[in-house]
Amino acid sequence: QKIQDPRFTSVEVDAGDLVALEGLIKKVNPDVVINAVDPRFVMQIFTAAQNTGVNYIDMAMSLSKAHPTDPFHKTGVMLGDEQFAQAEAWEKNEKYALIGIGIEPGMSDIFARYAQDYLFSEIDAVTILDGSNLTVDGYDFAPSFSIWTTIEECLNAPLLWDNGKWHTSEPFSGGVVFDFPEGIGPVECVDVEHEEVVLIPKKVKANHVSFKYGLGADFINTLKTIHALGLSKKEKVNYRGMEIAPRDFLASLLPDPAKIGPLMHGKTCAGAHVKGLDKEGKPYACYIYNVVDNQWSMDNYGDQAVVWQTAINPVIAMELIANGTWKPRGVVGPEWMEPKPFLDLIEQYGSSWHIRDEDPAGLAL
C-alpha cells in the first residue's frame, strides 16, 4: 500500500549492478540518492551516485576487512574507509555524501557533537549504548534489525578508540550492565564494531570512544552458537550442487524485521553516555538518548520501533540540507554538522530526546 502511494514510484534494480544503478540514477535525475539497502551494497550505490554526479545519503557505511594477521588487536580496513578515500573527488565535484545518518550511526553521533558543543569543556569518554526490552510474539529469536548486519557487527572484532589510536578486541568483550531509561531497565551490553567509533573521533575530542550493544545474555549465547556452527559465514559454500552463503540461509529462516511490528512489544533506546568535565570544569557525566515505543510507532506510522527510529534521521537531515541550515560538502558524517537544529526537529517529528545525569565515576570506559 505504501509503494502504491501516488507520491511515489517504484522500480526494481539490482543493487549490486553498478551499470544498472547508474542508468537508473540518470533516468530519474534525483537531487540525492538515499541508500537504505544492506551495507554489502554501500559501495556500489555510493559509487553510482559519485559517477553520475548526484548527492548521496546512507545510514550505514562501507564494510570493514579484518587485519590479516592480528584481527583482535589491530585494525585492517575500517568501516567507511572506502568512502572517505573518495572525499577529495566528492569535494572537487561540489557534491556531498552524508554517511551514517540513521539512528546508530546518526542521531547518536549528533548527541556526541552536542555534548562537546554545549555540555562539556573536556570529554574523557563517549560510549554509545543501545538497548531495548523488545519481545516478539511467537519467536524466541527474532532480531528487530537485519540478522546479516547484526552478525557482521557483533562477530567482527569490536573497534575501539583509545588515546588517539584505533584498535580492536575480542568479540563480546567490554561487558557492562547498563540501566536503560523509561522502564527498559538493566541490559547486558558488550563492545561491537560500529561506525560511531570511526566517526566521532574525527570531530569530537575524546580520549575514549566505544559502542556497546545491549544484546542480553540469551542473544549473545545464540550468536556464539551460530558462529560455532559456521552459520555466520558470508562466503558461499557448495551444498548438493547449490552455492549458498550460510549467513544468507540463516537470514531466510528468520522473520523479516520489517514485518514483525504487529508482534513486537516494548521500547528501544539509543544514546551517548559521555563523561568528562562540564563547562565549569567540574566532573560530569550524562546519557543523551532517544526512546521509541513500538506501540506508538505502529499506531502512528505502521512501522516497528527500530525501523522508524532509524528512518526518521535521514528525513530530518534532508530537510536541514534543503532549507540551507546544513551545507555538507564532500564525504562527511553527522558530527560535521551543527547538532541543535537537528535535535530541534526531532521534537517536531513527534519523537523526543532527553539528557539523564549519570555518576561521573561510572561507565564510559
What residue spans do the PLM features occupy?
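Adenosine-phosphate binding glycine-rich loop
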Residues: 82-133
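N-terminal Rossmann-like NAD(P) cofactor-binding module of classical short-chain dehydrogenase/reductase
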Residues: 25, 31-36, 49, 56-58
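C-terminal catalytic/substrate-binding lobe primarily of soluble NAD(P)-dependent oxidoreductases
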Residues: 117-365
